[in-house]
């Protein structure tokens, strides 16, 4: 990961969130302990995610952005900026808020980073693909994409702007697919199905999944591209420290069913599988995606060769080392082998 020769500090926005805190954790594993981390902690408990992590300075977003606007050199030489801070709620209806928070702020930060000769890596989203279910490639005509919600559109707006401004070949956009893992407890209804199903199973002994309304696809056989958060940040750091440019899918490249996901949760909890299929709300039926699967050819061609954590391995680690004991990333229980990674944990015990 030495494709760039820049010197200076690292900045991570959204640093207390699911992906942001995992990225700071990954930076720590690579010996980086002087990052500047930025977020909006508010009244949530996501501050707990920062406690075991090592960094040099924390700033609230409302302090950080005015400081760099007033003095672009406020933090000295900057080597890399990982912009993961955004409103990620696909149900958010305030378009004005999403434009300001997800689009304008990203424009301002990208302009500042490039002006400082810093590497700029930002969170785009697989939501930009809209209802498309096949051939999810990064080189698709961006104007052919139609996001299904305002969140996805706010991300697409920046992708389009970066292309128009001619800077997409100097920065990296990460199209995250279905990311799950520790440190998502603050996300409420936007948590992964792993977290929500874990709660359902421990409270009721069953998991509710939507019925299928597409001929040939049975209930629970709808698929998603699930990716463990530790893989997601390993990819982000690889791309940030390589000569990569443009948009990259961040997924496993393998579509798995909701039934597969839930079965892995029951296995991790050593409970018998018990799934209840429920009707899908009418408002959702017309725009529900029955399949997502990232193409990862560009990622592999960009030199990322590490294997992806299997769904069974990732779910087992997330549940047994984090959710059950109630721990955050960096405070986890040791793995059975002591290796500390999902890949060292057997898919079944």
Feature locations, PLM:
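NAD(P)H-binding glycine-rich loop region in Rossmannoid oxidoreductase-like domains
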Residues: 52, 61-101, 130
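Catalytic helix-loop patch of NAD(P)-dependent Rossmann-fold dehydrogenases
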Residues: 100, 104-108, 115, 119, ...
């Amino acid at each position: 990961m030495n494709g760039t020769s820049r010197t200076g500090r690292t900045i991570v926005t959204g640093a207390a969130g699911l992906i942001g805190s995992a990225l700071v954790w990954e930076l720590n594993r690579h010996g980086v302990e002087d990052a500047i981390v930025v977020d909006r902690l508010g009244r949530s408990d996501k501050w707990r995610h920062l406690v075991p992590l090592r960094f040099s300075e924390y700033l609230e977003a409302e302090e950080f952005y005015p400081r760099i606007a007033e003095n672009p050199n406020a933090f000295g030489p900057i080597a890399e900026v990982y912009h993961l801070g955004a409103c990620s709620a696909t149900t958010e209806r305030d378009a004005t808020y999403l434009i300001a928070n997800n689009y304008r702020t990203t424009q301002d930060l990208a302009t500042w980073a490039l002006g400082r000769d810093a590497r700029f890596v930002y969170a785009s989203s697989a939501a930009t693909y809209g209802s498309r279910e096949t051939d999810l490639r990064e080189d698709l005509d961006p104007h052919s994409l139609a996001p299904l919600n305002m969140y996805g559109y706010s991300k697409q707006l920046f992708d389009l702007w970066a292309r128009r401004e001619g800077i997409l070949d100097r920065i990296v956009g990460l199209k995250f697919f279905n990311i799950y893992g520790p440190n998502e407890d603050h996300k409420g209804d936007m948590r992964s199905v792993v977290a929500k199903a874990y709660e359902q199973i421990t409270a009721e002994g069953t998991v509710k999944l939507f019925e299928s309304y597409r001929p040939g696809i049975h209930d629970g056989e709808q698929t998603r591209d699930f990716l463990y958060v530790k893989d997601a940040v390993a990819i982000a750091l690889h791309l940030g420290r390589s000569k990569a440019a443009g948009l990259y899918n961040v997924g496993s490249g393998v579509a798995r069913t909701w039934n597969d996901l839930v079965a892995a949760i029951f296995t991790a909890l050593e409970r018998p599988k018990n799934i209840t299929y429920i009707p899908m709300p009418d408002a959702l039926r017309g725009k529900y995606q029955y399949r997502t699967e990232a193409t990862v050819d560009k990622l592999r061609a960009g030199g990322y060769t590490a294997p992806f954590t299997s769904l069974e391995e990732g779910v087992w680690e997330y549940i047994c080392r984090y959710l059950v004991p109630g721990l955050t990333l960096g405070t986890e229980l040791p793995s059975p082998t002591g290796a500390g990674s999902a890949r060292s944990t057997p898919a079944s015990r």
